[in-house]
Swiss-Prot record:
Cystine connections: none
Protein name: ATP synthase gamma chain
Protein's GO biological process: proton motive force-driven plasma membrane ATP synthesis
Subcellular location: Cell inner membrane
Pfam families noted in UniProt: ATP-synt
Organism this protein belongs to: Pseudoalteromonas atlantica (strain T6c / ATCC BAA-1087)
Entry superkingdom: Bacteria
Main location: membrane
Subunit (UniProt): F-type ATPases have 2 components, CF(1) - the catalytic core - and CF(0) - the membrane proton channel. CF(1) has five subunits: alpha(3), beta(3), gamma(1), delta(1), epsilon(1). CF(0) has three main subunits: a, b and c.
Gene name for this UniProt entry: atpG
Any one GO CC term of the record: plasma membrane
One MF annotation (Gene Ontology) recorded for this entry: ATP binding
InterPro entries: ATP_synth_F1_ATPase_gsu, ATP_synth_F1_gsu, ATP_synth_F1_gsu_CS
Length: 286
């Protein structure tokens, strides 16, 4: 059994760690609220433009933009959004499992796979996993903006425009609530059509003066908005997962301290009993 001094040292060390995890839990809770506010503010725009684009994909347009046309899939691309830091439970691990499983399905069909990584964790993972890395970006911070994602998005759009990839997906963790975050794979290109059940009525469009420049701009803005929404959703998910993980770590540290304190008390009791026994034995010998 460890000595009382060693046990006391362990208890002190765990208490110090507990203070750190408790502080990290409070910081994550504060950051989660701000991230939720950004996510909530951007959701209406992202959802509305998604609805408009879904109607566009179903409409009989006078000009069919290349982003609306399905083509034979020879190569797919994934924009994978992850965190820059760890200590957020299985958030990144679950996401990477989902995207690698999906990528392997394509590879089994003879389709090549490209990646664009947003976040240092995804950069590191896909460098190990393999696959062609077209772009990588990290260090977006706690308050990302659309400008931060434009460069990476344009690289993937150029690859699609040049026929280097035939389908583009966005991978991120959707914020459901504080206790639940869901890894999602959304198809960005070709633009997915709205399901007939979701169409209460079909819209028609009149473009002035010319549909081509309007669609060229609108569809690029749509892709940028969806990637940005993925970034803010992932940021809220990160802080929620970190808050939960740090709370669990703090609670576990408390349980461990209680267990060690019990061991220390037993060791101290045994030592006192031993001393009393030795004193009694010595007195009896005299």
């Amino acid at each position: 059994m460890a000595s009382g001094k060693e046990i006391k040292g362990k208890i002190g060390s765990i208490k110090n760690t507990q203070k750190i995890t408790s502080a990290m839990e409070m910081v994550a809770a504060s950051k989660m609220k701000k991230a939720q506010d950004r996510m909530t503010a951007s959701r209406p725009y992202a959802e509305n433009i998604r609805n408009v684009i879904g109607h566009l994909a179903n409409a009989n347009l006078e000009y069919r933009h290349p982003y609306l046309e399905d083509r034979e899939v020879k190569r797919v691309g994934y924009i994978v959004i992850s965190t820059d830091r760890g200590l957020c439970g299985g958030l990144n691990t679950n996401e990477f499992k989902k995207v690698t499983k999906d990528a392997k399905k394509w590879q089994e069909q003879g389709v090549e796979v490209d990646f664009a990584a947003l976040g240092s964790k995804s950069c590191a993972f896909f460098n190990r996993f393999g696959g062609n890395m077209l772009a990588a970006e990290s260090g977006l911070g706690d308050a990302p903006s659309v400008k931060d994602v434009i460069g990476l998005v344009r690289i993937m759009l150029n690859a699609f425009n040049e026929g280097k990839i035939d389908r583009l997906y966005l991978v991120f963790n959707k914020f459901v609530n504080t206790m639940a975050q869901e890894p999602l794979i959304d198809q960005l290109l070709p633009l997915p059509k709205s399901e007939d059940k979701a169409l209460k009525h079909r819209w028609d469009y009149i473009y002035e003066p010319d549909p081509k420049p309007i669609l060229d701009t609108l569809l690029v803005r749509y892709i940028e908005s969806q990637v940005y929404q993925g970034v803010v959703e992932n940021a809220a998910s990160e802080q929620a997962a970190r808050m939960v993980a740090m709370k669990a770590a703090t609670d576990n540290a408390g349980d461990l301290i209680d267990d060690l304190q019990l061991i220390y008390n037993k060791a101290r009791q045994a030592a006192i009993t031993q001393e009393i026994s030795e004193i009694v034995s010595g007195a009896a010998a005299v």
